[in-house]
Amino acid sequence: MACLTLALDAMGGDFGPCVTVPASLQALASNPQLKLLLVGNPDTITPLLANADSLLLERLQVIPAEHVIASDAKPSQAIRASRGTSMRVALELVKNGEAAACVSAGNTGALMGLAKMMIKPLEGIARPALMTVIPNQRRSKTVVLDLGANVECDSTMLVQFAVMGSVMAEEVVGIVEPRVALLNIGEEENKGLDNIREAAAVLKNTPAINYIGYLEGNDLLTGKTDVMVCDGFVGNVTLKTMEGVIRMFLSLLKPSGEGSKQSWWLKLIGRWLQKRVAKRFGHLNPDQYNGACLLGLRGIVIKSHGAANQRAFAVAIEQAVQAVQRQVPERIAARLEAVLPKSD
């Protein structure tokens, strides 16, 4: 198999190289065909590679970038001042064909704007959407978009998201005739904002989409739908709320350190319950599905959580590898051409 090269914004995220560098080494160790371009400040990155395996370092290259886009910077200002930043240099590597995909945990708005400006949307797509695939209670997967790229969406954008999500569910996840739902405040047809109701009317009359109607937020993990569509504001809040609840739930399974006075048999039962529940629900751990694909571009861009740890960022790198191997942009473009009208 040919070498697969990815560009990583090593300086992005809450923890920067402290997370991205060890995660990169972890990804290289698990994928012998992978080559990584770490974009950022060499003075910060290089010391973190001092004890790395020399064989791994043969497939890793540090690309200098003097500046970093702050996580709290306004997207418009960040884009104007983006030259020489680690995020922009990483995207330029994709644009120039030196890397097959870009992974960044940096400023979401800046990443969205720069990616749209440099890599360009697919024909027929107004604005890209952040998409992830999450596990559900049926041990299957649910495609969810938008997760924050577009705070406000009109009905046309929601329809485009539905088409892209359906393509991802079918072509990448492997679901035949995936069910598509719009996230709403109720399942009744008269519920919701105008843009949601207008999108529903269009989707009902789109034969290529298996539209099943509205679903509420409490159905996100039930597996009632294969694709859940919403605007970026609702999607981001919903996903992060869900992840927070899951993290709290999983943390309750860990020993609290307060059970030293418990009898041995209570401790034994407690450990048994922890293992059983962890086995049943551990697949819902957000670290295992970190990495949202900026869907609708001519190239592949993966957005990691800003607060991602080493394990989670390594998962985002793997998401990029899979997106490249499965030729996500090409597959989406082929399906969009048959479903969506071409722009003038």
UniProtKB/Swiss-Prot annotation:
Subcellular location per the Swiss-Prot or TrEMBL entry: Cytoplasm
What is a biological process (GO) this protein takes part in? Answer: phospholipid biosynthetic process
Spell out the reaction equation it catalyses. a fatty acyl-[ACP] + phosphate = an acyl phosphate + holo-[ACP]
Which InterPro entries does the protein's record reference?
FA_synthesis, Phospholipid_synth_PlsX-like
GO MF annotations, alphabetized: phosphate:acyl-[acyl carrier protein] acyltransferase activity
Sorted keywords for this record are: Cytoplasm, Lipid biosynthesis, Lipid metabolism, Phospholipid biosynthesis, Phospholipid metabolism, Transferase
Pfam families linked to this entry:
FA_synthesis
EC numbers: 2.3.1.274
Biological or metabolic pathway of the protein: Lipid metabolism; phospholipid metabolism
Check the record and name the HAMAP family matching this protein.
Answer: PlsX
Task: Describe, as the record does, how this protein assembles with itself and its partners.
Answer: Homodimer. Probably interacts with PlsY.
- So what does this one do? Catalyzes the reversible formation of acyl-phosphate (acyl-PO(4)) from acyl-[acyl-carrier-protein] (acyl-ACP). This enzyme utilizes acyl-ACP as fatty acyl donor, but not acyl-CoA.
Q: What is this protein called?
A: Phosphate acyltransferase
